[in-house]
Each structure stands twice: as C-alpha cells, then as structure tokens.
C-alpha cells in the first residue's frame, strides 16, 4: 500500500511541489494576521497552520477523487483511481488519519480553533456532494465555481486564526475589516487560478 500511495502522490498530489506552495500560503496568512495586530506569530502557530493546511489540500484532492470518479472512469481512465492503483476506500482511510492529526495539532495550539477546522470540513463535505444539487450547479458554471472556491477563504480563516485567536484579538474595527478584505481576495485569487487550471486547448478536451 505504501508504494502505491507514493506512486499516487507523485501523480495527483506531489508532496514537495504542493508542500512548498502550501507552506508559503499558510505562513504568509499567519504572518499577515500578526502584522495586522501589531505582533509576531509564534513558531507553533506557523507550524500548525502549515501542517493543517497541507492536510486540507490533501483532503480536497481525496474529495475530488470521489466527486469526479464517474467522469474520470469514463473520460480519464489513465488516472490512478480509475486504473486501480489505489481505491477510494484506501484514500478515505488516509484522509481520516490526516484528520486525526489535524485535530491533535489544532488542540495543541488552541482548542477554540476546532471551530474554524470544523467549518472547513463541513463546507468540504457538502461541496463533495455538490451541495446536493449537482445537476443544477453544473448548468451554472459561475455559481459552481464560486461555491467550490468559497472554501479558500475558510481555509485562510483557519490559517489566520492560528495567530489571532490564541492572541485574544477580536474581529472588529480595522483588524476585522482588513482581514475580511484578505479573505475576499483569497476567493478572487482562487477563482482566477481555477479558471486557468480548467482552461484546456481544444485538442486536449475530452
């Protein structure tokens, strides 16, 4: 199983490539929060934010494997799950194990962070189910994209909360407004990246 999972990550979730980007993403969000409140983030806050965010993005990959399994089997049979390299059940077990680690890290920093953690998981769960209206969403690509990209501000909220929540900063006045603008920007940036990622040349369409 270990060898198969290693082969899977190389194709669908390259640890080094994704890890560097996620580390920069998580650390910058935590540091921004500290900058806005006029302090410095703790090393523990940065470490927890980066590791938990890494877990989020892996779980999003697993969620996508489940959500897109029917289409992948039909149109992209060369991918790891359709061709039988790993099973959805095996990926679920790994994702649950990652979730246990996320809870442990979160509680080690501040138990109140369980709120933002559960919020991300809740959105991820309904997103995997296409908000229970898959046919309706697929006919409305803009709404589809925005509903899925809405998870990005929630992930950013968790990352910033790793700093401001243990520091006892309330979300009000200038701090809250600036943080809100940052979260909105993360939604816009995520949407732009998603549009670029899903834009295919005509000869690559299936």
Enumerate the predicted regions with their spans:
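Multi-pass alpha-helical membrane architecture of UbiA-family
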Residues: 1-206
């Amino acid at each position: 199983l270990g060898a198969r999972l290693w082969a899977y990550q190389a194709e669908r979730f390259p640890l080094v490539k994704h890890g560097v980007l996620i580390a920069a993403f998580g650390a910058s969000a935590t540091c921004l929060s500290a900058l806005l409140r006029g302090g410095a983030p703790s090393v523990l806050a940065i470490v927890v934010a980066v590791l938990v965010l890494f877990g989020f993005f892996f779980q999003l990959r697993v969620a996508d494997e489940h959500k897109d399994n029917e289409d992948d089997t039909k149109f992209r049979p060369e991918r790891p799950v359709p061709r039988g390299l790993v099973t959805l059940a095996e990926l679920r077990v790994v994702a649950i194990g990652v979730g246990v680690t996320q809870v442990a890290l979160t509680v080690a920093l501040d138990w109140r962070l369980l709120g933002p953690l559960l919020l991300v998981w809740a959105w991820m769960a309904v997103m995997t189910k296409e908000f229970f209206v898959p046919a309706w969403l697929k006919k409305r690509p803009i709404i589809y994209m925005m509903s899925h990209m809405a998870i990005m501000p929630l992930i950013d909220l968790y990352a910033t909360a790793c700093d401001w929540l243990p520091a006892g900063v309330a979300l009000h006045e200038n701090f809250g407004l600036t943080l809100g603008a940052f979260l909105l920007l993360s939604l816009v940036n995520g949407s732009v990246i998603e549009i670029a990622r899903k834009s295919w040349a005509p000869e690559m369409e299936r």
